[in-house]
Amino acid sequence: MTKVLIVDDSALMRRHLKEILEVHGGFEVMVARNGIEALAGLESFDPDVITLDINMPEMDGLTCLSRIMATKPKPVVMVSSLTETGAEVTLEALALGAVDFIHKPDGTISLNVSRIEREILDKVTAAAKARIRRSLGLSSRLRTASDRGAAKRTRPADSSPLPTLSLTEIGVVLIGVSTGGPGTLEEVLPGLSAGFPWPVVVAQHMPGSFTPVFARRLNDLCPLTVIEASAQMPLEPGVIYIAKGDADVVIGHRATRFVVNPMPAGPHYLWHPSVTRLVESALRALPPERIIGVLLTGMGDDGAEAMAEVKRRGGRTIAQDEASSVIFGMPGELVKRGGANLVLPASRIAGQLNAWMSRTKETVYGTGQS
């Protein structure tokens, strides 16, 4: 029996979430109206999973989450709106240690909650099995972002953008990630060195209203430029492209340039942006030896078979290890298929990519500088 603490100031929302879990079976549920009641329930009920609203009286969700992670860490699933403000706060919650989020329905709650019943059950069930990722803490991350932003603004002249690569020179790093991804990407991507010679394309399962906010957030954290991918955008060395949420993204070429192109969510793919579709498009567009695939934490198996094919054809792949994954679903499936050249903790992935790229820069540009 999984013990779930539902924290929400809306009596209707509490009731519907409780009914969904109890009707399905296998859940014991306690409810709380605000963060203060949640902290009391943390001690008396000792839940396996907490669903946590963001906007509540007396103590808001972020404050409550910080207290939970500081005193008695538990897997927390945030309940968030799809507004830009909701996206910003939810991403902050994920950075503080929440494992996932559920979209709070707009309009008629009773009708719209039923539409996301499967999502609620899947995410609460997965959260119960999740590893809690320790965050740096808000003040530490803000200092890190400030330092990186200053470094980006004061980058010396000899670290100017790399020359555009031709179709016969350029390669691409593809990163696929789902549950636990925002916090993991905030650990991995800032470690990529200035002057990284290949573009990086990231498919993070996320709503469309979240990805532009997430791209801006990562841009503040990273020495490389981070942008949300848009139609027919040329792939440039040292730029990180975030796939637009609720859609897919593919790689193709136009004239003498490779481009990244958002596409409507494909019906043959279960998750979006689809890691599988992204990797398959790269295999059609580029020689496999110029593809590096990285599969990070997440539920399911999106991207696992496609990245295994990259390895089979002579490309390189990295799977995040189980110990550092919030959910060892996607990377675990890659490992099961024998599709990972390396299995690494999140803390070592950027360093490995930098090492590979250092050799690439020496070959293409005649320099070994990283």
From Swiss-Prot:
Q: Which UniProt keywords are given for this protein, alphabetically ordered?
A: Chemotaxis, Cytoplasm, Hydrolase, Phosphoprotein
Signal peptide region = none
Q: What is its EC number?
A: 3.1.1.61, 3.5.1.44
- Lineage, top-rank taxon, reads Bacteria
Q: What is its main location?
A: cytoplasm
What molecular function does GO assign, one term? protein-glutamate methylesterase activity
Show where the Response regulatory domain sits: 3-119
Keyword flag Ubl conjugation? no
BP terms from Gene Ontology = chemotaxis
Give, as one word, the top-level EC class.
Answer: hydrolase
Q: Where in the cell is it found?
A: Cytoplasm
Question: Pfam families of this UniProt entry?
Answer: CheB_methylest, Response_reg
One GO term describing the cellular component: cytoplasm
Q: Which SUPFAM superfamilies match?
A: CheY-like (SSF52172), Methylesterase CheB, C-terminal domain (SSF52738)
Query: According to its UniProt record, which protein family does this protein belong to?
Result: Belongs to the CheB family.
User: What is the annotated role of this protein in its UniProt record?
Assistant: Involved in chemotaxis. Part of a chemotaxis signal transduction system that modulates chemotaxis in response to various stimuli. Catalyzes the demethylation of specific methylglutamate residues introduced into the chemoreceptors (methyl-accepting chemotaxis proteins or MCP) by CheR. Also mediates the irreversible deamidation of specific glutamine residues to glutamic acid.
Name the PANTHER family on file: PROTEIN-GLUTAMATE METHYLESTERASE/PROTEIN-GLUTAMINE GLUTAMINASE, PROTEIN-GLUTAMATE METHYLESTERASE_PROTEIN-GLUTAMINE GLUTAMINASE
Q: What is this protein called?
A: Protein-glutamate methylesterase/protein-glutamine glutaminase 3
Designated gene of the protein: cheB3
